[in-house]
Amino acid sequence: MYLSAGLRKIMDNPPVTSKYQHRSQDEMLSANLNHQQTTNGSPSTTMMLGGDAAAVAFASSSSNGAGDAYFRGLAALTGNASGISSMDMSNSTETGIVAPGHTETTVAVIIVYCVLFIIAAGGNLSVVITLFRSRRHRRSRVSLMICHLAVADLMVAFIMIPLEVGWRITVQWHAGNVACKVFLFMRAFCLYLSSNVLVCVSLDRCFAVIYPLRVSAARKRGKIMLGGAWFIAFANAIPQSIIFRVQHHPNVPDFTQCVTFGFFTTPAMETAYNLFCVVAMYFMPLMVISAAYTVILCEISNRSREKETSDTSHTGGMRLRCNDLTHIERARQRTLRLTITIVVVFVWCWTPYVVMTLWYMFDRESALKVDGAIQDGLFLMAVSNSCMNPLVYGSYAMKCRRPWRRQMAPNGVQTPNAAQRRSTDAVSGMVGPHSDRLTGRDNKDELVYEGGGTERNKLKQFGMANGIFARIGSTGRNHVTMAGGGAAGTSVATTRFGNCTTTVGGRNVTEPIRTVAMSSGSRVKSFQPSYSEFVMMADERSLMLSRPSFYSDPTPNEFDSTVDCGLTRSLDTGGWR
C-alpha cells in the first residue's frame, strides 16, 4: 500500500537470506554487483518514496539473476507510489552501473501527475474557499468535515504529487536527511488523514439518522471525531520519519537516496509493517464505514415500514396531518447520498491498487509479471481520488441549486418552497443552525431559552386535556402566547417532519414545520409575530426553534401564511416525559 514504508532501492538487491543477514550494509550493497538484471524494467521502488527513477540498477552477466527478484518486487507494490517499474534499463554484458533512462512511459506518467495536480489543487481550493465564505456552511457539521477532507486532498496535491514528479525527474534525493524524513512523514500523514475523515463523515451521518434531534451533542461529537482523525493520522505516520533516511551509494558516493534500506533486518518485518499500513489506511476505515452505513440502511428500512403501517401520526389527543415523504427526510437523503458517493469513489479509486499490493505481498513472483505501465496506472488511479472529491461536491451542489432557482420568483424573492428547502437543509446537516438554543432540564418547568444576547426566557409548560402546549413569557417583539381549549377543538399543527395543514383565521393553511399555529375552533386564540417561535414536537420531548427573517403582515391576532421563517433547528430538550 502506498502508506507502507517500502524500500526505494538504490540498486538491485539480493534476497535477504541467512548468508546476507550478518553482513554490513556496504557488503550487501556491493554484493549486488554480482547479480544480473534479468529484465529491461527497472528495479521497483516503493510507494512511500515516489517514482521508479530513484533507483539505479546494476547489471552483470555472472549470475542467474535470481537474487534481484526479492527487492525488485518489494520496491513495487508494497510502497511504490508509481508501481513496479517504468524506467527502461539497458541490459549489459559487463558488470557496472546502468543509469536509468526517461522512457515515454515515464514522461506520460509525469504529464498525468501534472494534470492531477491542476485538478486536485484547483478543485479543492474552490471547495475550501466556498465553505469559508458561506456563513451557513461554516456552521454545518457535514460542511466542516468536507472542508477537512478537502484540506487532506490539498496536502496530497501540494506534497505528494510534486514529490512524485520531482523524484522522477531528478532520480536521486537532493534535499537532505531532514527533508527526507519530513516529506515522507507528510506524505503518509495526508493519506491517513483522508481515510480517517471519511470515517468521521460516515459516523456523523449514522448518528444523525439514529438521533436526529441531538444537534448540540452532534456538533461537539463531530469536532471530537475530527480531532481524533488528525491525531490518529499523525501517530500512524510517525514511523515514516524513523525508518527513512538519506544514504550514499557505496560505489557512487555522489549518488544519494531517501530509503529505508537496512532498517528491516528480515523480509517478515517489512511485510508486517507494510500490512499494518494497508490495514490502517484502507481496511480498518472501510470496515467502520461499512458498519455505519449498514446501520443507516437498517434504520431507514425500519422507518419505511412504520410509515406503511400508518398514514397519520397520533400522540395523545393531537392528530398530525403530514406528508408521507417529507422535505426534511429528502434533505437528509440528499446528504446521505453525497456521503455515500464520496465513500464509493474512495473504494473505487483505491481498491485495485490495494489488491495488487496484497497480491505482491503473498505471491511476489506472479505479481512481478504484471506490466509496469499497468501498475503505474493503478497508482495514478488511486491518487486521482483527491481529484474526484471536488467533482462530487460540485455535482451535488449543482443538483441542489437547480430546484432552488426554479423556486425563485422573477423578481428574485425567495418563494415559500425555497425557504422551506433552506429549513430542511438545516435539519439535514448541510446548513448550519442559528446560535439560539434551548437548554433542556429534567424538569420541564425549568426549560430555559437562551437568545442571541443575554436574555434568558423561562419556558413554562402546562398540560391540557388532549395535548401539551407551551407558554413563553417575555417582553417586546419576543412575546408569544399560545393557549388552547382542550375539548373546545384546539389543535396544534406540529410534527417532526414535513408539512402540516392547520386552520388559521378560518382558513386552511399548509405550512412547513418552521411555522406554528394554535387554533381554538376556527380562530387563533392568541398569536403575536415573534422573533423566535417554539414548536412542540409530536414526541412531547422536543421543541423546534425557528428564526423568522421577516413577517409580511405582523398583525397581532392573524397568522400570515407568507411568512419566511428562515432556517430551522431541531433540538433535544433532554428528559421530558
UniProtKB/Swiss-Prot annotation:
Cytoplasmic membrane side:
130-141, 203-223, 297-341
Transmembrane region(s):
109-129, 142-162, 182-202, 224-244, 276-296, 342-362, 378-398
> What tissues is it present in?
Highly expressed in abdominal ganglia, and also observed in the carcass, accessory reproductive tissue, testes, head, hindgut, and thoracic ganglia of adult mosquitoes. Is more expressed in adult males than in females.
According to the record, the residues making up region (Disordered) are 409-446
Please report any disulfide bonds recorded for this protein chain, giving both cysteine positions: C180-C258
Stretches with biased composition (Basic and acidic residues):
434-446
State the CDD domains in the record: 7tmA_AKHR (cd15382)
Q: List the biased-composition ranges (Polar residues).
A: 412-421
Instruction: State any single GO MF term.
Output: G protein-coupled receptor activity
Q: Where in the cell is it found?
A: Membrane
Q: Which residues lie on this side of the membrane: Extracellular?
A: 1-108, 163-181, 245-275, 363-377
Does this entry carry the keyword Ribosomal protein?
no
* Bilayer disposition of the protein: Multi-pass membrane protein
What PROSITE patterns does the record point to?
A: G_PROTEIN_RECEP_F1_1, G_PROTEIN_RECEP_F1_2
Matching entries from InterPro entries are given as: GPCR_Rhodpsn (IPR000276), GPCR_Rhodpsn_7TM (IPR017452)
What Gene Ontology cellular-component terms does the record carry?
A: plasma membrane
Keyword annotations of the record: Disulfide bond, G-protein coupled receptor, Membrane, Receptor, Transducer, Transmembrane, Transmembrane helix
Q: Does the keyword Protease apply?
A: no
Instruction: List the PANTHER family hit by this protein, alphabetically.
Output: G-PROTEIN COUPLED RECEPTORS FAMILY 1 PROFILE DOMAIN-CONTAINING PROTEIN (PTHR45695:SF22), LEUCOKININ RECEPTOR-RELATED (PTHR45695)
Function, as annotated: G-protein coupled receptor specific for adipokinetic hormone/corazonin-related peptide (ACP) (EC(50)=10.25 nM). Is not activated by the closely related peptides AKH and CRZ, or other tested peptides.
Q: Which family does it belong to?
A: Belongs to the G-protein coupled receptor 1 family.
Q: What is this protein called?
A: Adipokinetic hormone/corazonin-related peptide receptor variant I
The upper taxonomy is:
Eukaryota, Metazoa, Ecdysozoa, Arthropoda, Hexapoda
